[in-house]
Amino acid sequence: MKLITCASYFGTGSSAITDLLSEYSSVHPNNEFEFRFIHEPDGVRDLEYHLVENHNREVSGTALKRFKKVVKFNSGTWFNKKYEQYFNGKYLEISEKYIEKLTDFQYKGFWAYDLANRSKFSYYFLGIFNKINIKRNAKKASVLPKEITYCSHPTQEDFIDATQEYTHALMEVLNNDNKEFMVVDQLLPSSNTVTCFRYFKDDVKVFIVDRDPRDVYILCRTNWRYDHLFPHDSVETWCKWFRYVRESGKKQDDSRIMYLRFEDLIYHYEEYVEKVEKFIGLDSKDHVRPFTRLNPKRSVCNTQIFKRNKKFEEDIKKIEELLPEFLYDFDSVNEENIVGAETKEKGTF
């Protein structure tokens, strides 16, 4: 099985790649959900740091608890199943086996952080209660009688082996029709990508997609409801944010990573489809549903949006001044040359 994943910088069009690949008969698409368990806070990457790179008898156990908490959150609930629905109800089971394999031993006990991790009230109230017990010489009295402390200090080799076994088990369940290729959206980050390849025994290829900041800005201000994810107090702050998220992921020279622009998939479709196929190893004859998911004649409406919105003209000028190296050269392309299926649909989406 060969894994394909996309990474972006928020709203930069990486779904165009997942849409394109879902048109191939040899690809199992997973383009309805993002799987970030490797690089999200308290995910696998953080777990390795605390268990292997910066081991501490108390912090490492806490890291396992935090990872376990993330696993439970990702698995979902009865009314919002999240990961479980995609992993055939086995995500939690496979993850618990992974945690068990990383745990050397465990015992009933706790330390101050276990109190603080509950709430400020718990930290102070239970802390006082614990001191009273100590002064009274209360036998076997504990404010957290069911709390478990995990002890784990694997070698890096053991951690990587366990993690590769873990990710492979998850991917096998996810690829339920045993296709040669499988798309897993946002599996790896756009920064420090290379360090995460070692977590997989399967071959992994990554597309990192970027987009003209002027269009991203207009979409941030007008279309997207996730306004808590980006600054909107001033265009200057927004430009700082745009540059910030890219500077955290300087371009990485690795044969398993392909950088591309969203706009190139629209204006230079045939050229870039060929590049994508070559990069992954796809056979063009397997492209059996062209333009059903990625239709350049439709997706072109998601480009040059800033030219159709006059409300933010002054902001666009400021973006052109502050972020010149990220601008796409729209003057060099012609919409009349765009290929695809004819459509009457217009407007951004």
Regions found by a protein language model. Give the residues of each.
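PAPS-dependent sulfotransferases, especially Golgi type II membrane carbohydrate sulfotransferases
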Residues: 1-4, 89-93, 98-102, 106-119, ...
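PAPS-dependent sulfotransferase catalytic domain
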Residues: 2-7, 12, 157-177, 187-195, ...
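A short acidic/basic microdomain associated with nuclease active sites
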Residues: 182-186
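A polyampholytic, Gly/Pro-enriched intrinsically disordered region
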Residues: 49-60, 227-237, 305-314
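Low-complexity, flexible helical/coil segments
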Residues: 40-45, 63-71, 217-224, 241-250, ...
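PAPS-dependent sulfotransferase catalytic core
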Residues: 1-158, 295
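A generic structural motif
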Residues: 25-27, 180-181, 201-204
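Polar/charged alpha-helical tracts
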Residues: 49, 61, 65, 69, ...
